[in-house]
């Protein structure tokens, strides 16, 4: 099992960040995902994310804790050389206009793919958090 965690402070309100992230919809607005489709809402919702090359990532929203501003999702199927991926996203208010986003995952992969996947996920989380800040500030 491998773990990747990225924590960053952004200059937006926690409520705005939480509302955008926890909907499990529209991730293409603030990520490298080209298009996404979500069915259902709350725990059990399914999302299909399409990469720019057309590859699809199939995800399930496992848990949403509104009070703690935290949710968990998993990748059920995708183009990555992993056998398990579970991610947790947490939103914490620093003050009225600053928020700490923590996005992390645990995944299983072949040893030769571990470093590449860790680097990929870390880069992806950094891009998402930075882009989220830009989208919410405009």
PLM segments and residue spans:
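Short N-terminal helix-initiation segments at or just after the protein's N-terminus
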Residues: 31-51, 123-126
